[in-house]
């Protein structure tokens, strides 16, 4: 198995390919990316067979921006016989992996693949039974074991392989299944909800997304992101010259400041979260977020960077480098991650968590 299969949003294959090529080189793994426009996936073929498995195991998945999922695979299985599609798949996995903890039969996230989804659901049951019979898959799901992937890109054609549960997306097809809340002011609310799922571990939600916290939402109108904060019982400074949804104002948790988000300063020093989804040039937003973190006006921030039509990976990389450089120059210790979320379109979502050293009177971040 000398290939790494990477899922991405259709239309962002070039960005995904540029990213995996750069990251692989940094990990001394060399190869080339095969890209098919609007396919929703990229195939990175390694020159050395062992490098594909090593990348999937050691290249930190959470550091990848445009990649929704990744797994190591062999050659594409073509023209699977309708009377027995299972045997070639079992043969591909035999000797490559054993005692896996889960099976995902998936398709790329394209309109053309939707018809294949019905087949995948039906096919999963007999395939699972066969893999268990051959001891490739455990008799029960186990979260700390490798995950088997079968990606159908067309009827009778699939990539077969596996990923590691501690270095992959836990979601089917790499997509969190979120339901749009009927009382939310806009669909943009799903961006922030997905960001919480991706960037904040579930066992830390009570501590980092708890009730009673103070938050600031820059460019808040009509309140899609504010809604997520209010829903978690936070007090929110909503900053926007436009109107906020009356349903949010009626909660008593929202203080609406009709002001320019680039000039607003928090009226108190215990703001934990800063969120921002303003339509502005990425460099301008990055600079603003850096200022807030350097001044200690927030502890964590989630913000969106709107992408240009071309050189999108380069634009994101440049802004993240600028952000890290400014924080480092000012002695700020922080974690910085970015992801092209499922609910993002021509934008990337960035998360920064600042850590403080022990300071008298200040609760340390763990």
UniProtKB/Swiss-Prot annotation:
It is found in: Cytoplasm. This is Ribosomal RNA large subunit methyltransferase M. Gene3D superfamilies: 3.30.2300.20, 3.30.70.2810, Vaccinia Virus protein VP39. GO terms for biological process: methylation; rRNA processing. Its EC number is 2.1.1.186. Pfam families: FtsJ (PF01728), RlmM_FDX (PF18125), RLMM_N (PF21239). Monomer. The active site is at residue 306. It comes from Pectobacterium atrosepticum (strain SCRI 1043 / ATCC BAA-672). Keywords: Cytoplasm, Methyltransferase, rRNA processing, S-adenosyl-L-methionine, Transferase. Its main location: cytoplasm. One of its GO terms (molecular function) is S-adenosylmethionine-dependent methyltransferase activity. InterPro entries: RlmM_FDX, RlmM_THUMP-like, RNA_MeTrfase_FtsJ_dom, rRNA_MeTrfase_M, SAM-dependent_MTases_sf. The keyword GTP-binding does not apply. One of its GO terms (cellular component) is cytoplasm. Belongs to the class I-like SAM-binding methyltransferase superfamily. RNA methyltransferase RlmE family. RlmM subfamily. It comes from the Bacteria. It catalyses: cytidine(2498) in 23S rRNA + S-adenosyl-L-methionine = 2'-O-methylcytidine(2498) in 23S rRNA + S-adenosyl-L-homocysteine + H(+). S-adenosyl-L-methionine binds at residues 188, 221-224, 240, 260, 277. Catalyzes the 2'-O-methylation at nucleotide C2498 in 23S rRNA. It is an enzyme of class 2 (transferase).
